[in-house]
A protein has these predicted regions:
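Generic beta-sheet signal
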Residues: 26-28, 39, 151, 197-199, ...
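Conserved beta-strand termini and adjacent loop/short-helix elements that scaffold enzyme active sites
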Residues: 31, 94, 181-183, 315
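Conserved short alpha-helical segments that host acidic/polar catalytic motifs at enzyme active sites
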Residues: 1-115, 119-120, 124, 131-135, ...
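Short beta-strand segments
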Residues: 29-31, 41-43, 60, 201-203, ...
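Glycine-rich phosphate-binding loops that contact phosphosugars or nucleotide phosphates
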Residues: 146-289
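Cofactor-pocket helix-loop regions in the catalytic cores of large enzyme subunits
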Residues: 19, 137-155, 278, 283-316
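Short acidic (Asp/Glu) and glycine-rich catalytic loops that position anionic groups and cofactors
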Residues: 43, 114-115, 244-251, 268, ...
Length: 316
């Protein structure tokens, strides 16, 4: 970038050349020492949004990180170049043409990204699980999966394990063959897609790079795609032909808690709603109560016993 700028003295032109040459995934924030009141940004396959404030603008990877300052944001797509001052945001395509971008507004509760008296985000999010399951189980899920002969679930990490639960429930209740695949491996497999196939992509953030690549492969092959994601307007939500949002709210802690349970609940509901037999959902409605009962137990004595130990073996 520095070398190109010295040649043409034009940051947008220099970044345009870079965008057309760069290989791989990236999201860059760039400052030119000759114009320190301007911030430049560009991305490919890594998340990037622009927060739009009053006399201030921001670059960030996701919306929750800017909610302390503003609830307005702009989604940036692959190969777009952004020039930001405190008063203005200008977006260009890779050929230096200005693009008109829509400003979105986060409609959720900004307090959801605060600790609200809890010592850690993880503890707070554990205590939100019962309400999340209640909201998710009350949501209307009317996507028809019975028209498909086979379903591929692609995901990474905890979302993959949620997919394993989904496989069991869908096969048992809907009599549809389900394959659960780790996204980083699925993208390199040969796909035959015999019959009518649905690819379900599960991701809390909606930005998981490997999962996103799987969706693009399925889309390119003309296969239906369904995203089960937690973040509205995320990349996977935008590229999937269909989307179901889990209602977990922002999850800040690295270790997933409420989002994982919301994914499992969504998959169970998807199976129940498409079941060929009538399913009694009374037990599902009781889940929030059971979760809250478990969470509110006093685990102090157990913690006191464990925290002095050097090693713990989990056998199962």
């Amino acid at each position: 970038i520095d070398s190109l700028y010295k040649e043409n003295n034009d940051m947008i032109k220099s970044l345009s050349i870079c965008v057309n040459k760069f290989i791989g995934s990236y999201a860059f924030g760039i400052i030119n020492e000759l114009e320190t009141d301007v911030l430049y940004a560009l991305r490919k396959d890594s998340p990037l949004i622009i927060g739009v404030g009053e006399n201030e603008n921001f670059i960030a990877s996701d919306v929750p990180s800017i909610l302390k300052y503003t609830n307005k944001y702009i989604d940036i797509e692959n190969d777009e170049i952004v020039k930001i001052t405190k008063d203005e945001v200008t977006v260009y395509d890779k050929n230096c043409n200005i693009i008109n971008k829509e400003i979105s507004v986060f409609e959720g509760d900004a307090n959801l990204v605060e600790k609200n008296g809890y010592e850690t985000y993880m503890l707070k999010e554990i205590h939100e699980e019962a309400e999340v399951i209640k909201k998710t189980s009350e949501a209307s899920i009317d996507f028809d999966i019975t028209k498909y002969d086979e379903i591929d679930i692609v995901a990474c990490g905890s979302a993959y394990h949620a997919g394993l639960v989904g496989k069991y429930m869908i096969e048992k209740l809907c009599n549809i063959k389900v394959n659960v695949c780790i996204a980083s491996e699925y993208q390199y497999d040969k796909h035959f897609y015999r019959g009518k196939t649905l690819v379900i992509a599960i991701s809390q953030s909606g930005e998981t790079a490997d999962t996103k690549k799987c969706v693009n492969i399925a889309n390119d092959m003309g296969v239906d795609t369904l995203g089960i994601v937690n973040v509205k307007g995320s990349s996977i939500a935008r590229i999937c032909k269909h989307v179901i949002y889990t209602l977990a709210g922002p999850e800040i802690a690295v270790a997933t808690t409420k989002a994982y349970l919301a994914q499992i609940t969504t998959l169970i509901l998807l199976a129940v709603k498409n079941s060929k037999e009538k399913i009694n959902t009374e037990d599902l409605q009781k889940l929030p109560y059971y979760i809250e009962t478990l969470i509110n137990k006093d685990y102090t004595s157990l913690a006191n016993m464990l925290y002095t130990k050097d090693d713990i073996y989990f056998i199962g």
